[in-house]
């Protein structure tokens, strides 16, 4: 089984660098279990199914990209990251270029009014450059994240030895992940609400 999954630009870069092998997604379905172990047992027995799949299933990444509106390719193709040009014999002006990792090139294109942004939700399957295989799935409270899992989420210490997230340093990995989580989910599912989340571990595979 193959399903799409959306990642932000920073998380795409973390996957491409090999630093991110895990993601947390809010459990949308209400869970009516009196104890935390009861929920884990129900997931293990398949009574509660993860909408992203089970170990062995594959995910293709949807990310923000740009579409060319018209540009003269002089001196050969743009030296871009993770992009092999148009697919399915497309006109290059209809090609989609991933934004993460190509910011400098896209800035030049934007200055020339040569491209428009396409939100990640609209990225078609053929344009995806990242394929993942699910290796493990479990459910837990958001605030139960461990230091090692925060690192698996793509957070790592900087040169000063402190964890880095959202452009600043934090005292520990959990605080860094809290900042990252709220930068994306604070409106609907803030850290303080401690929602149930799917913990999905994955490995990157070749298309």
Spans of features found by a protein language model:
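Secondary-structure transition motif
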Residues: 1-207
């Amino acid at each position: 089984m193959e399903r799409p999954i959306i990642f932000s630009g920073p998380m795409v870069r973390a996957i491409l660098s090999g630093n991110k092998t895990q993601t947390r997604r809010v459990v949308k379905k209400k869970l009516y279990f009196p104890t935390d172990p009861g929920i884990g047992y129900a997931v293990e027995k398949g009574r509660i199914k993860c909408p992203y799949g089970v170990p062995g299933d594959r995910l293709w990444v949807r990310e923000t990209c740009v579409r060319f509106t018209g540009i003269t390719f002089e001196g050969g193709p743009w030296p871009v990251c993770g992009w092999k040009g148009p697919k399915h014999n497309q006109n290059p002006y209809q090609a989609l270029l991933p934004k993460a990792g190509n910011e400098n090139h896209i800035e030049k294109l934007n200055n020339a009014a040569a491209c428009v942004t396409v939100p990640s939700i609209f990225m078609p399957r053929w344009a995806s450059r990242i394929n993942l295989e699910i290796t493990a799935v479990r459910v837990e409270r958001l605030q139960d994240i461990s230091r090692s899992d925060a690192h698996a989420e793509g957070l790592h210490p900087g040169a000063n030895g402190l964890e880095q997230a959202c452009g600043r340093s934090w005292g520990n990995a959990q605080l860094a992940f809290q900042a990252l989580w709220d930068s994306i989910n604070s409106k609907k599912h803030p850290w303080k609400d401690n929602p149930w989340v799917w913990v999905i571990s994955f490995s990157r595979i070749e298309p």
